[in-house]
C-alpha cells in the first residue's frame, strides 16, 4: 500500500508529547482559509515557487517542477508530494527512535488530512504501534466514522 506524503518534519516539540517526527500527508477535503499547511491541501504532487527566496541564478531556467526543485540553491522551488510505501516510511522515521524513547515522544500523523488516505494512515499507525512508538493523529475530523473506529 502506498501513500502520498507532503513532507516529514523532525525534532518537533509542538505536535504532542516529547520530541516527535511529524508526517504531513498530502490531501485534505477542506479548503480552510486559515490552513497552516496549504501545500498539503491538494491530493496531487505539486511544485511551489517562492519568489521572495529566488536569487535569479538561472539554474532552473524558469522551469519549476520535481526535477528542478532539488537543484535550487536557496529552496525557492520546493516539490510537495512523495510516494511512500508503509515499510519505507516507517524505516525512515525509525531513525529518530532514540529521540522518541529518551523524551517520551513519537510520531504525529498530520496533513492535509492524514485520514483522507485512510488505509495508508491506519497501516502506518499500526506499524509504529507494533514497534512501541507513540502515535498521535492530527485530524480535522471530516472523515467517515468507520475510519475513526480503526
Residue ranges of model-derived segments:
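Conserved Radical SAM active-site core
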Residues: 42-149
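N-terminal pre-triad scaffold of radical SAM enzymes
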Residues: 5-59
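Iron-sulfur (Fe-S) cluster-binding modules
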Residues: 1
Amino acid at each position: 500500500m502506498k501513500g502520498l506524503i507532503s513532507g516529514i518534519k523532525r525534532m518537533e516539540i509542538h505536535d504532542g508529547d516529547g520530541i516527535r517526527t511529524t508526517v504531513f500527508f498530502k490531501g485534505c477535503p477542506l479548503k480552510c482559509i486559515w490552513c497552516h499547511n496549504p501545500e498539503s491541501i491538494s491530493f496531487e504532487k505539486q511544485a511551489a515557487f517562492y519568489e521572495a527566496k529566488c536569487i535569479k541564478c538561472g539554474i532552473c531556467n524558469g522551469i519549476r517542477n520535481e526535477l528542478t526543485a532539488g537543484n535550487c540553491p536557496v529552496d525557492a522551488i520546493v516539490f510537495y508530494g512523495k510516494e511512500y510505501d508503509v515499510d519505507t516510511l516507517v524505516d525512515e522515521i525509525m531513525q529518530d527512535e532514540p529521540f522518541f524513547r529518551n523524551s517520551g515522544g513519537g510520531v504525529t500523523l498530520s496533513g492535509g488530512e492524514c485520514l483522507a488516505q485512510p488505509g495508508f494512515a491506519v497501516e502506518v499507525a499500526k506499524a509504529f504501534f507494533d514497534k512501541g512508538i507513540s502515535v498521535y493523529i492530527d485530524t480535522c475530523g471530516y472523515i467517515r466514522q468507520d475510519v475513526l473506529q480503526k
